[in-house]
Amino acid sequence: MSFYNHKEIEPKWQGYWAEHHTFKTGTDTSKPKFYALDMFPYPSGAGLHVGHPEGYTATDILSRYKRAQGYNVLHPMGWDAFGLPAEQYAMDTGNDPAEFTAENIANFKRQINALGFSYDWDREVNTTDPNYYKWTQWIFTKLYEKGLAYEAEVPVNWVEELGTAIANEEVLPDGTSERGGYPVVRKPMRQWMLKITAYAERLLNDLDELDWSESIKDMQRNWIGKSTGANVTFKVKGTDKEFTVFTTRPDTLFGATFTVLAPEHELVDAITSSEQAEAVADYKHQASLKSDLARTDLAKEKTGVWTGAYAINPVNGKEMPIWIADYVLASYGTGAVMAVPAHDQRDWEFAKQFDLPIVEVLEGGNVEEAAYTEDGLHVNSDFLDGLNKEDAIAKIVAWLEEKGCGQEKVTYRLRDWLFSRQRYWGEPIPIIHWEDGTSTAVPETELPLVLPVTKDIRPSGTGESPLANLTDWLEVTREDGVKGRRETNTMPQWAGSSWYYLRYIDPHNTEKLADEDLLKQWLPVDIYVGGAEHAVLHLLYARFWHKFLYDLGVVPTKEPFQKLFNQGMILGTSYRDHRGALVATDKVEKRDGSFFHVETGEELEQAPAKMSKSLKNVVNPDDVVEQYGADTLRVYEMFMGPLDASIAWSEEGLEGSRKFLDRVYRLITSKEILAENNGALDKVYNETVKAVTEQIESLKFNTAIAQLMVFVNAANKEDKLYVDYAKGFIQLIAPFAPHLAEELWQTVAETGESISYVAWPTWDESKLVEDEIEIVVQIKGKVRAKLMVAKDLSREELQEIALADEKVKAEIDGKEIVKVIAVPNKLVNIVVK
């Protein structure tokens, strides 16, 4: 057989690995450890798509490589299985979300195993397993005990179609929900919050110690949004009321000509004049219908209403009208801003729209034309005139503190984490509310608080979750006869994914989250690979929980993930018509290398686009494995380009990878393999070992595969293959194409053992040095010959070889040699007449 029969070979080795528990995590503590983590998937009904295996293949290559290097490797997989889609499906079909989830997991697992990933399935976790979420609930009770989980009446992002509130992070820029694209409105509700803000400074500072891309670190820094400035107190004219504004530029206070409160600010109703009451009430209602993102969109038209009240500017005693406007959020800062229209573009546009005064306090611009937002010396600012920004800020803060109307302040953009969902399919929050007004956490001995099985999972309609309908589960009585009600909100999907990497370390422990010694052995995660879409939410939440567990003494490290790598996106093929509208692939036909709309006949433009069901351009890995084999899919996805690049899927590229594997198969099975080395492949073999080793370490898998191709090309030119080089090459390709490598290893090594733990090959540095060198021979200054000669020959030897060359002899025949200039390792110049 001259080709690689994947349909026979791949299932054979998958069966072998499963039967022999080949990838069971090593426990020899004398060995170094390597923990390779994938972002575990949500097991959707659609199954795996070809984007999933890209990251999984990368961690699998590293895991197989490290095993061969003698490491204990922890390479696990599990399921982030709570979440809205399963519940939505259950509501639409009447099926149990648990059954639906179990079916999806079985399908995902089948697909993953068909790709030959070296997971230790003994460590599989599932966030919906009560033995798992017992510890999610335990972490919550600890947060509650420490005052980091609390209830608050807060305006939430309510999605009527989903029957639940969602976190700020789950609202898209257009003001719709990330899941489903439904309208989001603001609505006050009793919610559980987690005090992530208590960890803001540590979450910010500890980013510096992590081997993460700067772009991801910057996204987290921006989300945390640390600002240093001052709180300034403004009194409301004619009342005993006052409000506080946080500003990063207290030095511009002399240019503050009006103030703006969030429509929800507690002072609004108290200070609004009777003449303005109706307009204010209308505006407040309109603002409540918009999401935070829609309200703060810089491009939107400025709207606002004057309250009829005035604030007093503390630095000059001037009256400043107090407005309300929806671009100010009650949840951000103090819910109030001082407007300096001369030096802030949004304030300038607002002032122009409503004819409010603009006072320049920094020189350098023309504030009648636009806000001047650069720095300049202070003007029109009394005791700050002539000062630069830094000096002016220091002086005004000292003045405010001395007068008792302000002080220096650090704030964060980060808000506390909205932790409740009004849905059924999530972890029950282990809290009981008693009729005497107290609340207590469910004792640890009673955890897990198991999610009750029910067919009635529709939202209750009251804003509570469907659990509010389950009276038997809901109502409890204390030993002293006091009645209570269980918390009906459930946890968000982020809960289970915030600590799952810890449970992999000790997944069957019934006494604690994980054993301390095992946590010490395995943490931190050495490499975490996943999509950049989780840059803020999941990674920030997991870091927060990890730091909290560090403070409790549960985990030994301050950070969970030492190195993070975001793989790029695998794009599908899309087609657009002349209007730029996308056309589904089943409406496209190819003729003479061009693409046409089946129905209209219009020629279409081909371009990469995100794979989606609607475009019918999603590639199912099952189809690829069936036609080309898992090893082809693995090699192709790693060879497409750099791991972090977004690249379009190509059937031709897939075929190229398959042809390469067939060439590898033929090389090893048809070449004569000998115990003696004739030295012909010394250099290319040692170059290949060195390059592949270094490129796997630096995650440059595409260039590693390119080097393997170089070796195959060189080896194919030789009649025979040295056995040690054949073995070494098979080991080098094993992390990329493990099924093929196992099969070829049996033909060459004949041990009957798996290749998985055979020591990784090493290279001989001395074999990388060129033994021969090319020199040029010039006659009368023109190159007449190029010769391969031994390196470092003397002038005399070089001259002798050059003059003996047949080509050179023919050129100088019948001519007198005047002089021969020989430069070792470079050239021979012959002067004749």
Curated annotation (Swiss-Prot):
Enzyme Commission no: 6.1.1.4
Give the catalysed reaction(s), semicolon-separated: tRNA(Leu) + L-leucine + ATP = L-leucyl-tRNA(Leu) + AMP + diphosphate
NCBIfam families the UniProt entry points to: leuS_bact
GO (cellular component) term, any one: cytosol
Looking up InterPro entries in the UniProt record yields:
aa-tRNA-synth_I_CS (IPR001412), aa-tRNA-synth_Ia (IPR002300), Leu-tRNA-ligase (IPR002302), Leu_tRNA-synth_edit (IPR025709), M/V/L/I-tRNA-synth_anticd-bd (IPR013155), Methionyl/Leucyl_tRNA_Synth (IPR015413), Rossmann-like_a/b/a_fold (IPR014729), tRNAsynth_Ia_anticodon-bd (IPR009080)
Q: Keywords on this record?
A: Aminoacyl-tRNA synthetase, ATP-binding, Cytoplasm, Ligase, Nucleotide-binding, Protein biosynthesis
Motif window: 'KMSKS' region: 610-614
Identify the residue span(s) of motif 'HIGH' region.
41-52
Q: Which GO molecular function, any one, fits this protein according to its record?
A: leucine-tRNA ligase activity
Q: Which family does it belong to?
A: Belongs to the class-I aminoacyl-tRNA synthetase family.
Instruction: Output this protein's name.
Output: Leucine--tRNA ligase
Q: Which organism is it from?
A: Streptococcus pneumoniae serotype 4 (strain ATCC BAA-334 / TIGR4)
| Annotated ATP binding sites | 613
Q: Does the record carry Endoplasmic reticulum as a key word?
A: no
